[in-house]
């Protein structure tokens, strides 16, 4: 007996509906919302496909579209490629509902249809494009090269790539040769609350603005000297407090302001406080060992004048003396050969070779030193140099000018050390510039000319008190041919600072004076152009570094760099 499937199906549906507890009104509302959503989706898809068809015809007129669906191979023999102008023969409907794949002969046209009509894709692609925008390395390097120092230091914080690019030797060399650097004046050894603060104060001459550089390496260190060369500042010697005693230093610290980096080089052989220092470039043939050998040879010949020959001395010790002399000569020749090989290897790897000279100062027992040391950057070693001439006295100041290290003593004597040949020359000058001995004189080299600033009593008196009624600071120049001093100009300010410091930049003299009066520290920054006829001084900056400093005139020292 056959049973109808339809009644059984209706009966099962009715039973299922009876089991359900959901209300009919809820089911009806859900079904209506679902129908509206499906209808809206179909309308949007039809509009997008229609716009795509219009754009295809408008952009690529005559675009050939073929059906590459599943039935493509079966109808390949019957269907042929045709143009859009042949009443649509062989063309499939683009805006229809059939799901077929369309290939366009114009490369990328299909993607262009979809991208142009999809605003979200355009917005996302624009954001991705902006994310990947970058400058080539050569253009970025040229832009960084032209930044001032403060902006360049801020650029180091952008990313590691910018930091590494701005710290290379090639970048620094191109920045130096491109004349994009400006002069900076750095003030060291400023005191705060009676002790060394360790901070460095940098003055941007072009922007007339001071900057403070914090460092812990110089905190508590004082009575050191500084000199600058190759965009680096060298801090030489000094003292520090070690519990209940003072400690003298032999170490040398090197500060690179352009990258805010510190490093150390070889220490001196003797600890020195307040040494007279200087730095200058030398040729690749320069050798401290050669100059030392020349000095030893001269002393050997001088010591033999009026002496006895080896032949007339003890004959039994003649062979021993000859053997010791031959072994010493062989060892000296061998060591000299090894040093020359090391120099040649280092000269090929290094860019510019320079020497650092430190003379005088005080030792570990506060005794004045008449010795000196010279540092060779190629070998990173210090060597003893010839002592100061007999009776020269305590060195008060010094400067390097035209390859000669000039030193001036408290006894008003002048000597010069020939760096290439390695010996001192006593210089007799006349007349000696008058000075007040409570104020130290300062030697300055400016534009290959040698100057000295000293404080003396004014020559013009009122007849009542006499000539010692007013002290002035005068600028003197030494004629390097006739060895005579000539007065150049008079500083306009009263010499209140007994330790005023001066540096030079081409034809410009720069001076910093700091002194305490009525409980307040005053600071003055003055400059003088020596090429002008009057060589007059003018004030550049006043009272900008005196907020938290005191008694800074005791130990301050300055250095000038182009950064």
Curated annotation (Swiss-Prot):
F-box domain span: 129-175
Keywords per UniProt: Kelch repeat, Repeat
Keyword Acyltransferase found: no
Kelch repeats, residue ranges: 184-231, 232-282, 355-402
Family annotation (Gene3D superfamilies): 1.20.1280.50, Kelch-type beta propeller
Taxonomy, superkingdom: Eukaryota
Name this polypeptide is given: F-box/kelch-repeat protein At5g42360
Taxonomic source organism: Arabidopsis thaliana
């Amino acid at each position: 007996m056959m049973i109808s499937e339809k009644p059984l199906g209706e009966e099962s549906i009715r039973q299922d509906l009876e089991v359900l507890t959901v209300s009919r009104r809820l089911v009806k509302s859900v079904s209506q919302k679902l129908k509206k959503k499906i209808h809206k989706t179909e309308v949007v898809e039809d509009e997008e496909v229609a716009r795509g068809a219009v754009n295809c015809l408008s952009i690529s007129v005559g675009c050939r579209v073929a059906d590459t669906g599943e039935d493509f191979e079966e109808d390949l023999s019957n269907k042929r490629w045709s143009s859009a102008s042949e009443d649509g023969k062989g063309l499939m409907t683009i805006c229809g509902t059939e799901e077929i794949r369309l290939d366009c002969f114009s490369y990328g046209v299909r993607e262009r249809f979809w991208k142009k009509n999809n605003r979200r894709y355009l917005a996302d692609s624009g954001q991705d494009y902006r994310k990947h925008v970058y400058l080539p390395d050569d253009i970025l390097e040229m832009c960084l090269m032209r930044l001032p120092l403060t902006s360049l230091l801020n650029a180091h914080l952008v990313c590691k790539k910018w930091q590494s690019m701005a710290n290379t030797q090639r970048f620094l060399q191109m920045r130096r040769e491109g004349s994009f650097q400006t002069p900076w004046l750095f003030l060291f050894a400023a005191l705060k609350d009676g002790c060394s603060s360790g901070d460095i104060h940098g003055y941007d001459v072009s922007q007339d603005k001071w900057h403070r550089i914090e460092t812990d390496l110089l905190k508590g260190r004082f009575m050191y000297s500084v000199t600058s060369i190759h965009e680096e500042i060298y801090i030489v010697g000094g003292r520090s407090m070690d519990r209940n005693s003072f400690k003298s230093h032999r170490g040398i610290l090197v500060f690179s302001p352009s990258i805010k980096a510190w490093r150390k080089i070889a220490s001196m052989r003797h600890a020195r406080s307040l040494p007279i220092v200087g730095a200058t470039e030398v040729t690749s043939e320069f050798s401290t060992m050669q100059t030392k050998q020349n000095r030893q040879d001269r002393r050997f010949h001088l010591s033999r004048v009026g002496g006895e020959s080896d032949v007339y001395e003890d004959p039994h010790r003649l062979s021993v003396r000859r053997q010791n002399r031959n072994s010493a000569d062989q060892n000296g020749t061998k060591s000299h050969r090894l040093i020359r090989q090391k120099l040649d290897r280092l000269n090929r790897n290094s860019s510019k070779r320079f020497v650092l000279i430190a003379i005088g100062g005080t030792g570990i027992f506060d005794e004045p030193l008449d010795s000196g040391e010279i540092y060779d950057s190629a070998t990173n070693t210090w060597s003893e140099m010839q002592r100061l001439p007999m009776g020269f006295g305590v060195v008060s100041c010094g400067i390097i000018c035209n390859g000669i290290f000039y030193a001036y003593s408290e006894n008003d004597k002048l000597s010069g050390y020939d760096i290439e040949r390695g010996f001192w020359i006593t210089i007799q000058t006349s007349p000696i510039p008058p000075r007040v001995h409570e104020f130290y004189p300062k030697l300055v080299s400016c534009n290959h000319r040698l100057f000295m600033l000293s404080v003396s009593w004014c020559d013009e008196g009122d007849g009542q008190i006499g000539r010692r009624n007013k002290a002035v600071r005068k600028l003197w120049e030494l004629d390097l041919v006739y060895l005579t001093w000539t007065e150049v100009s008079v500083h306009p300010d009263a010499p209140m600072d007994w330790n005023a410091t001066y540096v030079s930049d081409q034809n410009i003299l720069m001076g910093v004076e700091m002194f305490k009066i009525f409980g307040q520290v005053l600071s003055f920054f003055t400059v003088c152009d020596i090429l002008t006829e009057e060589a007059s001084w003018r004030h550049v900056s006043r009272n900008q570094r005196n907020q938290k400093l005191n008694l800074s005139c005791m130990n301050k020292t300055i250095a000038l760099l182009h950064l």
